Each structure stands twice: as structure tokens, then as C-alpha cells.
């Protein structure tokens, strides 16, 4: 972005209408910024004055981007990927959007997503499946599918999304881009539709780590309107200090139990990675982690996240806001009205997950399921954070396999194992994690490298990710 490789004018001169066509064809787009005259067919003309009056002091001046459609934008339709909010116009804007606007970034659209973020494939939006940027028969990953696609296809140089389990990092792995989830609370969640507030993070997609650092300087700010907001010790230092060399030897760790599950492609690439690090005289420490604990990560995640989600969206009644069924000749009470509206306008997958959350938090089941899940989460977090007493960074593949087919996902075939589930620990702990391009078998068969760090070590994490990008030539076309 700093070198103007991907300027607004270059993007729009090349494909002013094609952007809209491409986004629509793969269901990556939900809503253009129509109410603010951000129609793409007119964007070159509308922004030409801004471009001519560009101010280099504004960090993201004239840089286009997209927002995941669960981030509120005042008077611009924000759906959360759900028919329930098909025409919803928020009366407020999210803090992260306001920060981007203040720094000159130009919103060109809202990106499709799994309904309210409850999905890991990009297949569960009311507005259609988002397919892989290189293969229409494969998934893009989710829930931030449209956001990843827009960056992968060079439609925009960066996008803002959310990550509750691995919703940024898994699509980044599948789409061969960089996906960054900072420490919990460093990017404000004010104005962001919740999924599971104890695990929700706002994060960034880009093609390069340097661009992630630039955007981080804009959006990582303490926000008094967000009770969970935390102040970073490195505000405004992410880009300027990105290439500063480390003054001491870095200790890398990896989970030894995961290696047994690597397929042949992963094993070969992983062996090469270990060999290269050792040749560079970096410590690579095998770490033990109870396999039985790894096996329960996904179950614990589902119990807690679905339970929090059903609470967060209890306000979806269709009475105060949202879609509603009009049956004037069919009188009904409050409960019947809500039931009818939810049945009509919420997706089947979302309703299934809400049922699980409601079951786990029912008075009869609360202690048996939800409270027990919270206790196990605490054990998982303690074990995970203890890893950083021995190492500075934990490395792992960002996925166990290449992108699944849309057909397999729709047939409910399993597509993850504990290699994938490991990414969820960073959400449990609130620690920073990043996925960078790594294993490229073909353009539609990629797996990222996941790098995790301790809480508030975000600057160091970006520095080491940048180092990997340079050392292993992980930049991509």
C-alpha cells in the first residue's frame, strides 16, 4: 500500500464495473455503499477529487477496502449474512469503521459471510455460498469468506473481518493471503455484531504482512466505548518497527503430537521448515500437549460459542427491528410472532446451533455442560499460555488439508481435525495469532503457516511474520 502498487485509481481504471460483477458472481458482496454514493460504476468520478487532493500524511488515504458485513456502518445496509437483517440500516457506525474513515480509507462494499459468523466454510450465508478464488467448486473458508476472497483477487488491498474461532486465519490459509487476529480487545468491538463476546476478535486480511502492520497502526486504538477494549503497548509502532531485527535468539516451538496427523504434503513442507530454521541456528523446541485436551477443543468451543450466541441474538424478534412476517388475518401472541419471524428469516444451520446453545444453558443442563465447558476452557488456556514460558512463538500448519469441496460441505462430511482446532486456543486465551502463505501445491491447494504469540506480543508477532515472509520468500502473486 505504501508503494502505491495497488492504488484506488489502478483498481478502478482496470475494472470499475468488473469489481461489482466479480463480487456478485461469487456471492462475496452483500451491499455496496449506495447510500453514500459509493456505487462502483461512479467511483472513479466520485473519488477523483479526493485522489487529486491526496494527503500523504493520512495513513490510508484513498486506499479501498471492504468490511465484513457484521460491522455496523451508519445508514448502509448491514445484514450479518442473514435474511433477518436484509434491509437493516444501523443508526450508528462501528469504531473500527470510523477510524478507517478518519484515516482516509475508502469503503467500497460489505463482504458476505456465514450467517452472524456461525460457520467455518463460507457456505452458510443467506445470500449464497462464497467459493474459492481459484476454483468455484471449493470453499473459501469462513466465516469471513467474502473478506478473504476480495483480498485474494486483488479487488482491495485489505479487508476488516472478525475471528471467533479461526474465522480470519482459516480463510487466509485457504485463499493464500495473510490473516491477523490481534490480542483480545486491541481492535474495538464497539458496533460489531457479536457471536461469542468472550472470544470475538476484530482482525485484518491483506496480501502482505507490511500492509497488515499499516492497517494495525490505524485500527489498534483503545476505545472507551468498548468495555473489553485494551490498550496496546505498541500503538502506532507496528509498521515503523516492522523490520527492526531482534536483539536475541528467538525460540520457536511446535506441538509434537500434531505431527502424527500431517498428510504427506504437510510432512514434507514441515520437515523443510524445521531444517531451514535449524540451518539458521534458531531453536526449534518440540512441545508436549495432552492429546486428550486437544481432542476436546472443538466441543468446548461449540458449547461456549453457541451458548453465548443464543444469548446475544435473543433480541432478534422482528418486532423492534429486522424482517417480520405479515399475516394480518392470523392473530398471534408475542411468542408466536417471534417464532414465526425466526422460522421464516433465520437459516437452518444457525437455528441448529442456537438449539445447541439453548440446550447447554437450560437450567437443567447449565452445570453439566456450560459450566463444565468453561472449566475445561480454563485448563486449555493455562496449558496453552504455559507454552510461552519455554518458547517465544508456536508454529503450526493453519489447516490439516487443502480446501474442501462445496459439495462435501453441503453433505456434512468432516473437514477438520485437531490440527485445525488448535487455532481456536488463541481465541480461548485472547492471544495474537497470524496465518501467512506457506504451502502452495497448486493455486487452489494452499495451507498457511500459523504463528502464535503470548498476549500483547502483537508487534513481535508481526515482526517475526515479516521475517518469515522475507526469509522463505512467502510473498505471492
UniProtKB/Swiss-Prot annotation:
One of its GO terms (biological process) is translation. GO terms for molecular function: ATP binding; glutaminyl-tRNA synthase (glutamine-hydrolyzing) activity. It is an enzyme of class 6 (ligase). InterPro entries: Amidase (IPR000120), Amidase_CS (IPR020556), Amidase_dom (IPR023631), AS_sf (IPR036928), GatA (IPR004412). It catalyses: L-glutamyl-tRNA(Gln) + L-glutamine + ATP + H2O = L-glutaminyl-tRNA(Gln) + L-glutamate + ADP + phosphate + H(+). One of its GO terms (cellular component) is glutamyl-tRNA(Gln) amidotransferase complex. Keywords: ATP-binding, Ligase, Nucleotide-binding, Protein biosynthesis. The active site is at 68 (charge relay system), 143 (charge relay system), 167 (acyl-ester intermediate). Its EC number is 6.3.5.7. Heterotrimer of A, B and C subunits. Belongs to the amidase family. GatA subfamily. Allows the formation of correctly charged Gln-tRNA(Gln) through the transamidation of misacylated Glu-tRNA(Gln) in organisms which lack glutaminyl-tRNA synthetase. The reaction takes place in the presence of glutamine and ATP through an activated gamma-phospho-Glu-tRNA(Gln). This is Glutamyl-tRNA(Gln) amidotransferase subunit A. It comes from Mycoplasma genitalium (strain ATCC 33530 / DSM 19775 / NCTC 10195 / G37).
Amino acid at each position: 500500500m505504501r508503494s502505491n502498487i495497488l492504488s484506488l485509481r489502478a483498481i478502478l481504471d482496470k475494472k470499475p464495473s468488473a469489481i461489482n460483477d466479480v463480487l456478485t458472481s461469487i456471492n462475496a458482496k452483500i451491499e455496496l455503499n449506495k447510500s453514500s454514493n459509493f456505487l462502483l460504476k461512479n467511483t472513479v468520478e466520485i473519488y477523483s477529487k479526493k485522489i487529486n487532493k491526496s494527503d500523504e500524511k493520512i495513513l490510508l488515504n484513498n486506499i479501498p477496502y471492504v468490511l465484513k458485513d457484521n460491522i455496523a456502518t451508519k445508514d448502509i445496509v448491514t445484514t450479518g449474512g442473514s435474511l433477518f437483517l436484509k434491509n437493516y440500516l444501523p443508526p450508528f457506525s462501528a469504531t473500527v469503521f470510523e477510524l478507517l474513515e478518519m484515516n482516509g480509507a475508502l469503503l467500497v462494499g460489505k463482504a458476505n459471510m456465514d450467517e452472524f459468523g456461525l460457520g467455518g466454510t463460507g457456505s452458510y450465508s443467506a445470500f449464497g455460498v462464497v467459493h474459492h478464488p481459484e476454483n468455484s467448486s471449493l470453499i473459501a473458508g469462513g466465516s469471513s469468506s467474502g473478506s478473504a476472497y476480495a483480498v485474494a483477487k486483488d479487488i482491495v488491498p485489505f479487508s476488516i473481518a472478525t475471528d471467533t474461532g479461526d474465522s480470519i486465519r482459516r480463510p487466509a490459509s485457504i485463499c493464500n493471503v495473510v490473516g491477523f487476529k490481534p490480542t483480545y480487545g486491541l481492535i474495538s468491538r464497539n458496533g460489531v455484531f457479536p457471536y461469542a463476546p468472550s472470544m470475538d476478535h476484530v482482525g485484518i486480511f491483506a496480501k502482505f504482512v507490511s500492509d497488515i502492520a499499516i492497517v494495525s497502526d490505524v485500527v489498534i486504538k483503545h476505545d472507551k466505548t468498548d468495555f473489553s477494549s485494551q490498550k496496546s503497548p505498541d500503538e502506532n509502532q507496528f509498521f515503523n518497527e516492522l523490520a527492526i531485527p531482534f536483539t536475541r535468539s528467538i525460540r520457536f516451538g511446535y506441538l509434537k503430537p500434531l505431527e502424527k496427523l500431517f498428510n504427506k504434503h504437510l510432512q514434507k513442507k514441515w520437515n523443510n521448515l524445521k531444517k531451514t530454521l535449524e540451518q539458521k541456528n534458531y531453536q526449534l523446541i518440540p512441545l508436549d500437549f495432552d492429546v486428550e485436551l486437544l481432542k476436546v477443543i472443538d466441543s468446548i468451543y461449540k458449547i461456549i460459542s453457541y451458548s453465548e450466541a443464543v444469548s446475544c441474538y435473543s433480541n432478534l424478534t422482528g418486532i423492534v427491528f429486522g424482517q417480520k412476517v405479515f399475516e394480518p388475518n392470523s392473530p398471534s401472541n408475542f411468542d408466536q410472532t417471534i417464532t414465526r419471524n425466526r422460522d421464516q428469516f433465520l437459516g437452518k444451520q444457525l437455528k441448529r446451533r442456537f438449539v445447541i446453545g439453548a440446550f447447554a444453558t437450560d437450567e437443567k443442563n447449565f452445570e453439566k455442560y456450560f459450566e463444565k465447558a468453561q472449566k475445561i476452557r480454563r485448563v486449555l488456556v493455562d496449558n496453552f499460555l504455559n507454552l510461552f514460558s519455554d518458547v517465544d512463538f508456536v508454529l503450526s500448519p493453519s489447516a490439516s488439508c487443502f480446501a474442501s469441496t462445496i459439495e462435501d460441505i453441503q453433505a456434512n462430511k468432516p473437514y477438520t481435525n485437531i490440527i485445525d482446532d488448535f487455532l481456536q486456543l488463541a481465541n480461548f486465551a485472547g492471544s495474537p495469532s497470524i496465518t501467512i502463505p506457506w504451502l502452495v501445491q497448486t493455486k487452489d491447494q494452499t495451507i498457511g503457516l500459523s504463528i502464535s504469540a503470548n498476549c500483547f506480543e502483537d508487534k513481535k508477532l508481526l515482526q517475526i511474520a515479516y521475517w518469515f515472509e522475507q526469509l522463505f520468500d512467502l510473498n505471492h502473486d
